[in-house]
Amino acid sequence: MAVEMFYDADADLSIIQGRKVAVIGYGSQGHAHSLSLRDSGVQVKVGLKEGSKSREKVTEQGLEVDTPAEVAKWADVIMLLAPDTAQAEIFTNDIEPNLEDGNALFFGHGLNIHFGLIKPPANVTIGMVAPKGPGHLVRRQFVDGKGVPCLIAIDQDPKGEGQALALSYAAAIGGARAGVIKTTFKEETETDLFGEQAVLCGGTEELVKTGFEVMVEAGYAPEMAYFEVLHELKLIVDLMYEGGIARMNYSVSDTAEFGGYLSGPRVIDADTKKRMQDILKDIQDGTFVKRLVANVEGGNKELEALRKKNAEHPIEVTGKKLRDLMSWVDRPITETA
């Protein structure tokens, strides 16, 4: 099924320019949205709790900052860009008491609306504007006169103006320069979670760790195993990112290409596909989100235990040692203390 696409010519920037926008959160996406909205002539304030370390940064970058409740009271369009697990509490405590008839509540990801963790009143427009790239890229492309493709979706539209408003917002952060794709909260949420769990984070991580274990258990040096299954992964992913799977296969050696065709289906087979389908089902029926909520309500104990177990894997020890030799690799704060 073909998607519906929109560009700058389809968007009316004056719509969002005539509104007051509160951006709650100033992380990767929050700073990109806020600065680009301002540069597009939109009235914008940032909502951060008292004592937030980001407040000084917001002020230094020339934006107004106040508490989430105060900016929600001031605005008629609220973009909630806090972490998924914090959004329901922010909505209940700070946003919902300040919503008025005709306000719009926007999100950068559909999880809380799609799974009913946030239940907004019927007289409020509920929409989503989700750039398909990290915040620093969204901002850099905007400054360069370009843009990152965006998704838009409308879940609730009491006044029939939701799509035009979302498209105007997307244009104000540069999305319509590249292309805006119309989707639904259901489609964005379920595809995003599946991609993260089965392929991008969960699937790739376990593939790398298992490959490392197989090589080390066969007697190969951990350093050699690390280079072959983790370090070189970036080279392959970059080729796929730039030109798809065909570009990657064209660029690697014939030996690598031929071996990949033969062995790839032995690693990822029909049984793997069935388990991936089971993961998708757990996402669709809410099983995953119930566990996510239980983890948060339990003080993140399950997440912390999983993090600890993962950090203790031998590939992490080997990787830290090898990255000390790589002056060109940006080092995370956890490795520079």
From Swiss-Prot:
Cofactor annotation remark: Binds 2 magnesium ions per subunit.
Protein name: Ketol-acid reductoisomerase (NADP(+))
NCBIfam families: ilvC, PRK05479.1
Domain KARI C-terminal knotted, chain residue ranges per copy: 184-329
Similarity field: Belongs to the ketol-acid reductoisomerase family.
Organism this protein belongs to: Mycolicibacterium vanbaalenii (strain DSM 7251 / JCM 13017 / BCRC 16820 / KCTC 9966 / NRRL B-24157 / PYR-1) (Mycobacterium vanbaalenii)
One of the GO BP terms on file: isoleucine biosynthetic process
Superkingdom, taxonomy of origin: Bacteria
Pfam families given in the database record: KARI_C, KARI_N
Enzyme class, UniProt record, top EC level: oxidoreductase
Any GO MF annotation of the entry: NADP binding
The keyword Oxidoreductase appears for this protein: yes
Segments forming domain KARI N-terminal Rossmann: 3-183
PROSITE patterns attached to this UniProt entry: KARI_C, KARI_N
